[in-house]
UniProtKB/Swiss-Prot annotation:
Pfam families in alphabetical order: Ribosomal_S21
GO MF terms, alphabetically ordered: structural constituent of ribosome
Any one GO cellular component localisation term in the record: ribosome
Gene Ontology BP, a term: translation
UniProt family annotation: Belongs to the bacterial ribosomal protein bS21 family.
Sorted UniProt keywords: Ribonucleoprotein, Ribosomal protein
Protein name: Small ribosomal subunit protein bS21
NCBIfam families: S21p
Taxonomic superkingdom: Bacteria
């Protein structure tokens, strides 16, 4: 679970900004987006192939 503690003189906006950044670093947002809808196994394979080609 991602946790951010708000300091005494810290605004809520800056704490929220840090929280969102932490979520993005942990990969939580990407995971939520990936599970937003059903992805067929063939689509998963194609996405992974394209991703591996992109890395090369």
């Amino acid at each position: 679970m991602t946790e951010v503690r708000v300091g005494k003189d810290e605004s809520l906006d800056s704490a929220l900004k840090r929280f969102k950044k932490k979520l993005q670093e942990d990969g939580v947002l990407a995971d939520i987006r990936r599970h937003e809808y059903y992805e067929k196994p063939s689509e998963k394979r194609n996405r992974k192939k394209a991703q591996s080609k992109k890395k090369k």
